[in-house]
Swiss-Prot record:
The protein's name in its UniProt record: SH2 domain-containing adapter protein E
Tissues where this protein is expressed: Expressed in heart, brain, lung and skeletal muscle.
Keyword Transport belongs to the record: no
Source superkingdom: Eukaryota
Originating organism: Mus musculus (Mouse)
UniProt feature, compositional bias: Basic and acidic residues: 149-158, 214-227, 268-285, 306-332, 349-361, 373-383
Domain SH2: 393-488
Signal peptide bounds: none
Annotated segments matching region Disordered: 46-193, 214-236, 260-332, 347-384
UniProt xrefs under PANTHER family: HEAVYWEIGHT, ISOFORM A, SH2 DOMAIN-CONTAINING ADAPTER PROTEIN E
Length: 492
């Protein structure tokens, strides 16, 4: 029979409790207590092992547990422990030694800062010590071990429920993990698998994918459902173009391209070619083909040319324009003969007949230039035996301003001969240069001969002077490279 503790006595009920009280008073803090008690259970022996060598009359020990009387408050802790050991040796080993070890583990966890729940369980176990049996003690121990195993599993998954867990709990959980049953961990593993399956990565942008992301067909189809903003993959664009060509498009431009590329019936081709031939013959008789009426590259079939020519209103050239087609809106390498012919008509007075295209076009703008243009080409030969009054380039008595106005529309190196307005000379040659018009005075010597300057040759008549300098360079500074090339005819 165990006696109740005396009033005023301390709550240390066993040898382990008294030892814990002394250690708690000497150690600096809970951490040191936890470290000390971590190694303490390894050297701890059970009551039966301690009772074997000494027997009933053995040496009393410090860490013995009393079965009945509690120490008096007047004595020290060491003497009370000795008395408890003596009484334990006389009475034999107690029955609740394992219960005291469980209570010791609960006290260790309470000192290390465990949760309230563990402290509550430990306190309950301490209060119910006198009423528990051996079966109840073993059940409490296994329950506590399974709780430690659950804590270790949660820490392994990164979700620790006990933030202040010490090293003692981890060591005891690792030592008792072999005895744990896998049935207690099954529901938690199943929940973790279900949560992982629900966390599916959905990526909507191609360039935001991580390198290990796996895209499914459903995600790609979901991206294609959105509105088309003009940017798409090359494969998708090719598929869209193929679908438009197969079904047909409402776009008029696409329809026009399909009509141009598609085959036509033979009867329609013959009609179009006949219309094109009639139209082309009218164009040749009326006016030459323009730049926007005929494409630069010749077409292979007559259908495209006919479609272009059946729309004369789309041409950039107006129908009322009398200017030649070679004069504007055509490149230089195109219709080169027409351009050269038009230039020769304007400035050279070519004897070549106009082309077939220019026969039916009236050139009203050229009528004002024809009286002042020469009928000969470059390097016109001058007849020196013909009298001066019969030469076409002799204009008689005209002023300097009138001579310049007649040379204005002409090319460079155009010339005419007129009577000089100064009293020093009788005749003067008006010449057009790149800088403007110059007037060369023909000097007359005492023996009635003509020369341009003192170093030049002397001639008997003005036609001989013009004939000579139509093949030789003029002896004047600024005109060394020029000759009399283009005579300007006088007005009739």
């Amino acid at each position: 029979m165990r006696r109740p503790p005396a009033p005023g006595a301390p709550r240390c009920l066993s040898w382990a409790s008294s030892l814990f009280c002394s250690a708690a008073s000497t150690l600096p803090g809970p951490l040191m207590a936890a470290k000390w008690f971590k190694e303490f259970p390894l050297t701890l022996k059970t009551a039966s092992e301690r009772a074997r060598p000494g027997g009933a009359g053995g040496k009393p020990r410090k860490n013995s547990e009393t079965g009945g009387a509690a120490p008096t408050p007047g004595k020290g802790r060491k003497n009370s422990a000795a008395e408890l050991g003596a009484s334990k040796a006389s009475s034999g080993p107690p029955k609740d030694s394992r219960l005291s070890r469980d209570s010791l583990q609960g006290l260790i966890q309470a000192a290390a800062g465990k949760g309230r729940k563990n402290s509550r369980v430990t306190a309950t176990a301490t209060e119910e010590e006198p009423h528990r049996g051996a079966v109840t003690k073993s059940a409490g121990c296994s329950t506590y071990i399974s709780r430690l195993i659950k804590v270790d599993t949660q820490e392994k998954n990164g979700k620790s429920a006990y933030p202040g867990g010490g090293s003692t709990s981890s060591s005891s959980s690792s030592s008792s993990s072999a005895s744990s049953s896998p049935s207690s961990l099954g529901p938690e593993l199943d929940k973790a698998k279900i949560m992982r399956q629900q966390d599916t990565v959905i990526i909507l942008e191609d360039y935001a994918d991580p390198y290990d992301a796996k895209r499914t067909k459903g995600q790609r189809d979901a991206e294609r459902v959105g509105e088309n903003d003009g940017y798409m993959e090359p494969y998708d664009a090719q598929q869209m173009i193929t679908e438009i060509r197969r079904r047909g498009s409402k776009d008029p431009l696409v329809k026009a391209l399909q009509l141009l590329d598609g085959p036509s019936e033979p009867g329609e081709t013959v009609k179009v070619e006949a219309t094109a031939k009639r139209r082309s013959s009218k164009d040749l008789l009326g006016k030459p083909p323009q730049l926007y009426d005929t494409p630069y590259e010749p077409s292979e079939g007559g259908q495209r040319v006919a479609e272009v020519k059946t729309r004369p209103a789309d041409s950039r050239l107006p129908e009322e324009d009398d200017r030649p087609a070679a004069e504007y809106e055509q490149p230089w390498e195109w219709k080169r003969e027409q351009i050269a012919r038009a230039l020769s008509v304007q400035f050279e007075g070519s004897d070549r007949p106009p082309g077939r295209e220019d026969a039916g076009r009236p050139h009203h703008w050229q009528k004002t230039l024809k009286p002042t243009l020469s009928d000969h080409g470059d390097g016109e030969k001058v007849d020196p035996g013909l009298a001066l009054e019969k030469q076409p380039w002799y204009h008689g008595s005209i002023s300097r301003a009138e001579a310049e106005s007649r040379l204005q529309p002409c090319k460079e190196a155009a010339y005419l001969v007129r009577n000089s307005e100064s009293g020093n000379s009788k005749y003067s040659i008006a010449l057009k240069t790149s800088q403007g018009c110059v007037h060369i005075i023909v000097a007359q010597t005492k023996d009635n001969k003509y020369t341009l300057n003192q170093t030049s040759a002397v001639f008997d008549s003005i036609p001989e002077v013009v004939h000579y300098y139509s093949n030789a360079k003029l002896p004047f500074k600024g005109a060394e490279h020029m000759t009399l090339l283009h005579p300007v005819h006088k007005l009739h």
